[in-house]
Structures are given as C-alpha cells and as structure tokens.
Amino acid sequence: CYEINGELLLIDCGVLFPEDDHPGVDLLLPHLDYLDDDKLSRVKALLLTHGHEDHIGAVPFLLKRRPDIPVYGSKLTLALVEAKLKEHRIRNYDLRVVREGDTAEIGEEFDVEFVAVNHSIPDALAIYVKTDAGSILNTGDFKMDQLPIDGRITDLRAFAKLGEEGVDVFMVDSTNAEVPGFVRSERDLAPAIEQTFDQATQKLIVATFASHVHRVQQAVDAAVRHGR
C-alpha cells in the first residue's frame, strides 16, 4: 500500500497457506483492517502483478468492503480474479485489463507503467509507479527464462530504460532467491515429459500446479501426440 497526499494505491492482495503449526486454518489473510473506512475510501486502485494465490487470493475479501475499487491486471490475471469474485457473489466490480507497455494515470498522484515479466504463470507484469515524491518499481514474481513456451520474456530493455529514468525504491519479489544457481527454462522439461510418455505402458497421472499453464499445455500436447 502506497500513500501520498491522501491518495492510496494498492499492489497485489494475496493469501498465504498455513504451515503444519496452523491446524484447522484454511487461509492466512493480510491485515486488511489497516484499511479503515477512511483509508478505504481513499484507495484509487488495486494493481495486480499476476494470478497466483499469494498475489490475488484476498481480492474478494477486500472488494466485499468496497467493490468499486478499480482493479488493474492482465487478461489472465483478471479472469482468475473474476472467477473468485463470482464465487464470493460480489457484484458491480471494476476490472480493467492492461498489457505490457500500457500506462495509466491513477487519481491525482500516481502515474503507472506495466512491464512484461516471465513467470510460471502467463501474463505476469511488473509495475512502475511514479509520483511527485519519487518512483517505485515493483517486479512481482519473475524469472529469467530466455526461451519460454509463449515467447514472452522478462523485458530487460524496459527495466534498463526505467533505471536510466531513475528508480527510488526497487521492490523485488524473492521467491527461491536463497537457492543457489539458476532456474531451468520451462522448455527444457519437454524432453523429460516426452520420455515419460514414451516409457509409460499403463495409466499416466500428471501432477502439477493448476496455474502452471505452460507445463499443463506441454503435458496435454504430449498426450495428444501419444494418443492418450
């Protein structure tokens, strides 16, 4: 949550899943009570980086309190959000689809630009926010896969351009940052998937995250090739 001159801008609104020491707990919600009625009335928009639960899972709980908050995100991200809003029976919401390279003036205080990043879910975006007090670049989750299945890479040129213009605060998501080495390209998994289908003589069960669309697509493509 960023606040300047009485206007508030939110970036992402997710949930966490409980660990073993939280028996009986389904979800861990953010402290939305920070947004009292006064602050909530001054929220100009909610910007979403991508469609994973830890970034969008709490959106329905926020919009239950004020459904008319404009929500910006990519087409896939907002499709996932809309499904959640319908499940929670929330109406009169305001979803605004954006693409990489798009800009938006939000309220009187925030100028926003969206930048393409690659991630394990398609349509992820980084968000650059410029204000009179300074600028913030929020990466969202990302990875450096130069050969992604959909050909959509992290736009390092756009990041370099923003760096030249000046970034006062760089907010970098750090999932697995403590793990040494580099993540493999999603495309590198294709031979292993193909080999598994070649060798399987009976029923084959594929387990993966439902949101890992590219991996699911590779499994479906392999199944079609093998007549399964």
Show which residues each predicted segment covers:
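His/Asp/Glu-rich metal-coordinating catalytic cores
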Residues: 1-47, 52-227
